[in-house]
Amino acid sequence: MGKIIGIDLGTTNSCVAVLDGDTPRVLENAEGERTTASVIAYTDGETLVGQPAKRQAVTNPQNTLFAIKRLIGRRFEDEEVQRDIEIMPFKIVKADNGDAWVEAKGQKMAAPQVSAEVLKKMKKTAEDFLGEEVTGAVVTVPAYFNDAQRQATKDAGRIAGLDVKRIINEPTAAALAYGLDKKGGDRTIAVYDLGGGTFDISIIEIDNVDGEQTFEVLATNGDTHLGGEDFDNRLINYLVSEFEKEQGINLKNDPLAMQRVKEAAEKAKIELSSAQQTDVNLPYVTADATGPKHMNVKVTRAKLESLVEDLVIRSLEPLKVALADSDLSVDEITDVILVGGQTRMPMVQAKVAEFFGKEARRDVNPDEAVAMGAAVQGGVLAGDVKDVLLLDVTPLSFGIETMGGVMTKLIEKNTTIPTKADQTFSTAEDNQSAVTIHVLQGERKQATYNKSLGQFNLEGIQPAPRGMPQIEVTFDLDADGILNVSAKDKSTGKEQKITIQASGGLTDEEIEAMVQEAEANKDADKKFEELVTARNQADQMIHGTQKQIEEAGDALPADEKEKIEAAIKALEEVKSGNDKEAIDAKTQELMQAAQKLMEIAQQKAQAQQGADAGEQPKQDDDVVDAEFEEVKDK
């Protein structure tokens, strides 16, 4: 089996790691960075990912997509999506199936399709390092992701050409990375994971028994729409309102200006983690009839903290729930680990330390721990890592809608996965010949307040008084946290099974079409890369030849010079085109024509060497080395 890589597919940044011997190793991308910005830009004929996409965002805001993880597996009507529509510079649109999709360059795309571009870059980074094709991956998701979001993440992997061997929760992955080299006694750790768009808290017990480490998740909780992007947005709104007070102009109507403000806010937020004050200075941010306008706003750490304090406090509520669910008190937590870039904010660190009554550990890299843990799990699945057992849990309860619009739970939240549960139900009316099984995920008793995962019918039930037929419903939850449901009529043996495909979500046909499109683009991207390489070689050849013509001077016969210049002109005519073969052919012709230049250059070099040898002075045998001391006039 080939290497199974570990990928942290983040809202703001993504990271890829691989097991190097026994140690997880974070890999650098083509730009030499250990994390890749989860930003995708669509330009004329090219798709940019990471830093190249981020760099051009100011001039191309409508076609530069970021924080797509906030949309993955979500419906357009979701309250969180509606909030994002107001603040995102790109278009969020409603798909035919009701999902939240995005639009760029006039093309509508599903969130998994866009996220697949980031996964493709992670895959390529690993392949460049390993020198072989990579197909297997462990991809992490927020612990509090529901079934639809997990399924959509797997779909993104498939579109990127990856076989997602396992979906694991981000805090659990971080605990794996942290605990792997801690071979001491048992410990109970709290992983507080505040990333770019999501927040999780997991309470995990690490046991060491006879050399085997067991990582058991006791409880998990969180908020899939709370993260660094929300902190950025608070600061963006403050900067925009300050500018409006001063200049009377609302920048929210200007996408280019808003993109600049977004970048400046993100930078200021990061600076305020180490400085007490920073200046947000944006010259020529916009203009009106009176001329150009500049933004210059001083932001103190105290001001930023006042803007986001409620967000930090909001993150503490899930901590209380997770502790209660695991039947533990704060005193029983051995270590606190902070994961996610937003945990670098001093206020976050202080509030978490205050809650747990202890400082968080400093020996965990908040940006890399999750990918490293995913690589460890990849090693476990590939058989390269022995003596490590991971027991994760489902973050939310699963059940079905029963009479009166009630949700009846079959699998409770924080149940260790994989797991299976069944329960027998009956009909609500006399002579009922079919039942609809409506599958739900959530914690509310009222069915409508929970997430609908889908529904299916069991037909052909024999007529009988209500309450008589015996219908056995079985829930089978796999290690990825994805649900399979079956319903069986015990009297007839008729059975209906489904893998939960939410009322939204991508169908297999849609995913396959996207895989084919990605493959086609892969070939197109390769051809484009080859074309650019050919153009660059042509440029170098022209520049080098022109330089040699100058150096050759009169030594180059006029007819040869004419021949070479004609070859240069022919190459210049084709090098801007899209015909790689023509560029290669004309480059070759120029090389042939420039043979005379090579001969002249060699002759000159040989003549120079001969001259240098003749000019060397004869050593006088009577000369004696002496040391001189400089005498200065007094």
Curated annotation (Swiss-Prot):
Keywords: ATP-binding, Chaperone, Nucleotide-binding, Phosphoprotein, Stress response. It comes from the Bacteria. It holds the Pfam family HSP70. Coiled coil: none annotated. The modification Phosphothreonine is found at T198. Residues 601-613 have a biased composition (Low complexity). GO terms for molecular function: ATP binding; ATP-dependent protein folding chaperone; unfolded protein binding. Residues 601-634 are annotated as: Disordered. Induction: By stress conditions e.g. heat shock. Acts as a chaperone. Belongs to the heat shock protein 70 family. HAMAP family: DnaK. This is Chaperone protein DnaK. It comes from Aliivibrio fischeri (strain MJ11) (Vibrio fischeri). The lineage of its organism: Bacteria, Pseudomonadati, Pseudomonadota, Gammaproteobacteria, Vibrionales.
